[in-house]
Amino acid sequence: MHEIFKKLSNRMVGAMMIHTQLTELFNFIDLEADAKRQKKQLHEESDGLLKLEKYAAQHHHILITSDNPPQVDILNLDILERPNDKLSPDDKIHLIQYALKEWIEWEKKSKVIYEDSYRNLVDMSEIAAADFVLQYVKDVDKELRDAELLYRVRDAIDWDLATIYDKQARLSK
């Protein structure tokens, strides 16, 4: 069970890294509402990690530490070396698409890890622990659905920057 919790912990630390970097990226291209969404996800991941650590300690008497989180570096792009005001509209569209694709791929992989963890706990007859982990499965499933919907909505408007920025302004109020 310790290894299952450690795998979840490592993934959550990685999730905090990706949401931090997505927040930075969206702030860089002035997508304030998207940055706020990522910051909210960052806080939810942090809370989830603390709940996992508390659950493991109080219910299973084990201390879990993140010793091998995935290395996340989505900001390692040449385009980000330029000042924001030197980015073309196409550059910004590319960055938005890139960020959303990275987020979606991260959540897809997270969902597999969480579902496998749930399944392994059920197989071990650790039903209470599996039930605890099931909430993470549901959370990542919802986050994945939201990320995919955001991508589809923006794709449906053909990545029109004026519309995207207008909606950001309305959502940020």
Predicted regions and their residues:
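Iron-associated oxidoreductase/ferritin-like identity signal
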Residues: 1-173
